[in-house]
Amino acid sequence: MAAKVFESIGKFGLALAVAGGVVNSALYNVDAGHRAVIFDRFRGVQDIVVGEGTHFLIPWVQKPIIFDCRSRPRNVPVITGSKDLQNVNITLRILFRPVASQLPRIYTSIGEDYDERVLPSITTEILKSVVARFDAGELITQRELVSRQVSDDLTERAATFGLILDDVSLTHLTFGKEFTEAVEAKQVAQQEAERARFVVEKAEQQKKAAIISAEGDSKAAELIANSLATAGDGLIELRKLEAAEDIAYQLSRSRNITYLPAGQSVLLQLPQ
């Protein structure tokens, strides 16, 4: 009797385990920011996109393919040539995500690694096309314009593959050794020219100052000559008195100087 009970319990447990396995295999989860495409072994890729949450499928017949629909960054380095045939090394940073409604087409025509298959090729194509419109110098001075044109063209091109580009930016821009040396030489020449211009301007200012000073001396001499012609010897005597007063004032402030009136003698007691 007990053996039959244990046998029944074992069969029930086995059936329960099998049922649990079947139910578990018929469930799948789609995490936040993700979408799922269903592949059916008999009908192929279904033209539906499954949203977030827990969903049912037919075990061993259907299989979910999960896609991350959140924005992801990718850096694409490209070596190309400018309009004036200078080598340009550019790195483009792209923030991309797939169009959720087009995931079945993306999976069917490109595959799960769509970003690896599409982004490097179209980025190289667009960058070469845009950079070839500008000289090397313009790529530096008009970098914002270049970045905007690359972004517009690349966004339009990526849309044909079912991709959305949230941001496109130039993060790295360098040139060949010859162009870099030419730019450095130009900067040195500009600095030397600026220094020479400063020296010339300084000399001009000094020249003007000397002219102004000479004109002032000439004017002062003219005024003195006119004063002498008008006042005669009286002006000279006045200047002598002013000079004598100034000398007397300076002597009175010194303790080591003795003033001796004229016509008087001073006896000095010398040692015998």
UniProtKB/Swiss-Prot annotation:
One of its GO terms (cellular component) is mitochondrial inner membrane. The modification N6-succinyllysine is found at residue 202. The modification N6-acetyllysine is found at residues 128, 186, 202. InterPro entries: Band_7 (IPR001107), Band_7/SPFH_dom_sf (IPR036013), Prohibitin (IPR000163). It holds the Pfam family Band_7. Induction: Induced by PDGF. The modification Phosphotyrosine is found at residue 249. Expressed in brain, heart, intestine, kidney, liver, skeletal muscle. Highest levels in heart, liver, kidney and intestine. Also expressed in flagella of epididymal sperm. Expressed in lung tissue and pulmonary artery smooth muscle (at protein level). GO terms for biological process: animal organ regeneration; antiviral innate immune response; B cell activation; cellular response to interleukin-6; DNA biosynthetic process; epigenetic regulation of gene expression; mitochondrion organization; modulation by host of viral RNA genome replication. It comes from the Eukaryota. The modification N-acetylalanine is found at residue 2. GO terms for molecular function: complement component C3a binding; complement component C3b binding; enzyme binding; histone deacetylase binding; protein heterodimerization activity; proteinase activated receptor binding; transcription corepressor activity. It is found in: Mitochondrion inner membrane; Nucleus; Cytoplasm; Cell membrane. The modification Phosphothreonine is found at residue 91. Residues 177-211 form a coiled coil. Keywords: Acetylation, Cell membrane, Coiled coil, Cytoplasm, DNA synthesis, Membrane, Mitochondrion, Mitochondrion inner membrane, Nucleus, Phosphoprotein. Protein with pleiotropic attributes mediated in a cell-compartment- and tissue-specific manner, which include the plasma membrane-associated cell signaling functions, mitochondrial chaperone, and transcriptional co-regulator of transcription factors in the nucleus. Plays a role in adipose tissue and glucose homeostasis in a sex-specific manner. Contributes to pulmonary vascular remodeling by accelerating proliferation of pulmonary arterial smooth muscle cells. In the mitochondria, together with PHB2, forms large ring complexes (prohibitin complexes) in the inner mitochondrial membrane (IMM) and functions as a chaperone protein that stabilizes mitochondrial respiratory enzymes and maintains mitochondrial integrity in the IMM, which is required for mitochondrial morphogenesis, neuronal survival, and normal lifespan. The prohibitin complex, with DNAJC19, regulates cardiolipin remodeling and the protein turnover of OMA1 in a cardiolipin-binding manner. Regulates mitochondrial respiration activity playing a role in cellular aging. Belongs to the prohibitin family. The mitochondrial prohibitin complex consists of two subunits (PHB1 and PHB2), assembled into a membrane-associated ring-shaped supercomplex of approximately 1 mDa. Interacts with STOML2. Interacts with MAP1LC3B (membrane-bound form LC3-II); the interaction requires PHB2 and takes place upon Parkin-mediated mitochondrial damage. Interacts with STAT3 (unphosphorylated or phosphorylated at 'Ser-727'). Interacts with CLPB. Interacts with CD86 (via cytoplasmic domain); the interactions increases after priming with CD40. This is Prohibitin 1. It comes from Rattus norvegicus.
